[in-house]
Amino acid sequence: MSRASLVELTNLCVICDDSRILVQDQVGSGVVFPGGHVEPGESMLDSVIREMREETGLLIEHPALCGLKDWMLEDGTRFIVALYRADRFSGTLRSSGEGRVFWVEREDFARLDTIWGMREVLRICDSADYSEMFYSEEKEGWVLLG
């Protein structure tokens, strides 16, 4: 019996600039950290660098993998988001068709209308205590693991 399963691979990145973090008001969704899908044949690292360039105009340097966010889709596919953090970048900030990007002070982040687990993502990217967040149907919410 095969243990292979369907997986959808994506990424997001918490870009930090001193006390500010970059967020995206994603069209039709709410506030998220920018990110996107991994293309066939592309490494996870290359994909997050490409996505940040496409969605924010910024070229991130040496993004650090902080952990994973994952859950099961109704069709049995496991959806995996690689969570990165970057403190070094260059370029000029610009929005894309994905949504408006803007800096927010960390202390103001909790007041934003974020979607599905973004506060937990920030906790993972800010702490070595956790390395994964999994959506548990049994617990009816996100579980931080580490």
Spans of model-derived segments:
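Conserved Nudix-box catalytic region and its N-terminal flanking loop in Nudix hydrolases
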Residues: 17-54, 142-146
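Residue-level detector of high-confidence beta-strand sites
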Residues: 24, 68-70
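Conserved N-terminal beta-strand and adjoining loop/helix that marks the start
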Residues: 1-21
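A short coil-to-beta-strand element that immediately follows conserved catalytic motifs
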Residues: 59-67
